[in-house]
C-alpha cells in the first residue's frame, strides 16, 4: 500500500511540474518570422532618438559648485540637529553588548535595544541607529 501511494505521489508531482512548465507565459510564446520582423521594426521606431550634448568647462564648474553647496548644506543641517535629552540611567541595567535575556532589565544606553537571535537563546544590547 505504501509503494502505491509513493508512486501516485510521484506521478502527481510529475504531472504538476509538466503542466506548469509546458505552457509559457503569453509574451514568451513562439511566433513566426514575419511577426518577429514587424515587431522589431515597430519597436525601434517607437523609442525616441537619443541626442548627445557636449558639456563645456563652464557648465562643469557650475555643476561642481552646486554639488559642493549641496554637500555643505547637508553637513550643516546634520550638525544643527538638536540632541534629544537622555533619560537618567536606572540602577539595574544591562551594558551595551552584554546579555539581556528577557527577564533581564533594560539596556543602559537609551539608543540601544535588546536583540535576540536563535529563537531568543542569545540576546544582547545593540545600538541600532548611529544618529541617536
From Swiss-Prot:
SUPFAM superfamilies: Agouti-related protein. Residues 1-22 form the signal peptide. Disulfide bonds join 93-108, 100-114, 107-125, 111-132, 116-123. InterPro entries: Agouti, Agouti_dom, Agouti_dom_sf. GO terms for biological process: hormone-mediated signaling pathway; melanin biosynthetic process; melanosome organization. The keyword Glycoprotein applies. Residues 62-88 are annotated as: Disordered. GO terms for molecular function: melanocortin receptor binding; neuropeptide hormone activity. Residues 63-79 have a biased composition (Basic and acidic residues). It holds the Pfam family Agouti. It is found in: Secreted. One of its GO terms (cellular component) is extracellular space. Glycans are attached at residue 39. Keywords: Disulfide bond, Glycoprotein, Knottin, Secreted, Signal. Residues 93-132 form the Agouti domain. Involved in the regulation of melanogenesis. The binding of ASP to MC1R precludes alpha-MSH initiated signaling and thus blocks production of cAMP, leading to a down-regulation of eumelanogenesis (brown/black pigment) and thus increasing synthesis of pheomelanin (yellow/red pigment). The presence of a 'disulfide through disulfide knot' structurally defines this protein as a knottin. This is Agouti-signaling protein. It comes from Macaca arctoides. The gene is ASIP.
Amino acid at each position: 500500500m505504501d509503494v502505491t501511494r509513493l508512486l501516485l505521489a510521484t506521478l502527481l508531482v510529475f504531472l504538476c511540474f509538466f503542466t506548469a512548465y509546458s505552457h509559457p507565459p503569453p509574451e514568451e510564446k513562439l511566433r513566426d518570422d514575419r511577426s518577429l520582423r514587424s515587431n522589431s521594426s515597430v519597436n525601434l521606431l517607437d523609442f525616441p532618438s537619443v541626442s548627445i550634448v557636449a558639456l563645456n568647462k563652464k557648465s562643469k564648474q557650475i555643476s561642481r559648485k552646486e554639488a559642493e553647496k549641496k554637500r555643505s548644506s547637508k553637513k550643516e543641517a546634520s550638525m544643527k540637529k538638536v540632541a534629544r535629552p537622555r533619560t537618567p540611567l536606572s540602577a539595574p541595567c544591562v551594558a551595551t553588548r552584554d546579555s539581556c535575556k528577557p527577564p533581564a532589565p533594560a539596556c543602559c544606553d537609551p539608543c540601544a535595544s535588546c536583540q535576540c537571535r536563535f529563537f531568543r537563546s542569545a540576546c544582547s544590547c545593540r545600538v541600532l541607529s548611529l544618529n541617536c
